[in-house]
Amino acid sequence: MIDQLSLERLSAESAPSQSLSIRYLSGGLAFCVRMLSPAREIVACGFLPFSLSSEKKVEEKFLELFYTYDFLAYPYHQIYCYYSPESAVLVPTELVTAGQEGLWLFEGLDDVKPRPVGDLSVCYLSTPLPEETKSFVTRADSTLVQLFRRTLLVVELIPACFPALSLRLEHSRGFLASELLVLLEGNQLTLLAHRRGEVFSYRQVSLRVPSDEKSLGEEVLFYLFAQWQHLGLDGAIDRVALGVPAPDFAMEVVREGQAYAHLKELLAPYVQTVEVFTYSPC
């Protein structure tokens, strides 16, 4: 979905006072242009679909969008690229050493898929959390990361869960209870637990991707409750937040929304507070 009127407001002259956020998805790029003011007003946002040609590589489809939409190459003050990590762990920021992030993602972890020694198709990144005492150390697709860095001059790479997480951290600062944040995208489930603005648990799971929303909701419930019990959370006090990307970005959110509706019904007897919220994915 593209709002042509909002795109007409974009120009190379105004770009230095704006930021561009993009999120790579299987079908294209979600984007958002914001002002640099404290309110970060949205100037334009939407979804740019890739070419339907199955023969083209991801790099070719990505560059084709840049040739088609001039505004992607404007000289923005800052550019943020959101990516989905293959795996990630929480690490105290003071213990993260540049160039040695991969040591934290050893193959003994349940959620880390083994890779051949010396595999150059992946890279390791670290990003401080908003509360700054911990960092996400991630393993990502090197092809995509290098593509971002070659194409965009001033780029900051950020894990895809950060927009929703930042929103919930700010929201939860006034609560004493813990909150388990649930993010579902395709076959990837992300579970983040936080309390009073501080993240204390993270888990990423690859789902079987059931054919119907009911089965999908039940599979999410299985992993959600396993994490809930592992963390010792209390259904009468602690909360669950189910994140749904805003429809403006034209991502396939209907299936996830229906799965969440079923999940919320299943959780009702056990968790007193379950909230479904929308967020901008970039």
What are these regions (language model features)?
Residues 1-39:
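N-terminal basic/disordered segments at the start of proteins
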Residues 21, 71-87, 235-252:
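Short glycine-rich phosphate-binding loop at a beta-alpha junction
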Residues 23-29, 123-236:
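Small-residue (GG/TT-enriched) beta-loop-alpha framework at ligand/catalytic clefts
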Residues 29, 49-53, 87-90, 246-251:
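Short acidic, S/G/P-rich loop/turn micro-motifs used as interaction or catalytic elements
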Residues 200-281:
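Accessory, usually C-terminal, subdomains that scaffold auxiliary metal cofactors
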Residues 16-18, 77, 178:
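Residue-level marker for the onset of beta-strands and adjacent loop->beta junctions
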Residues 45-51, 60-170:
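Active-site neighborhood for divalent-cation/phosphate handling
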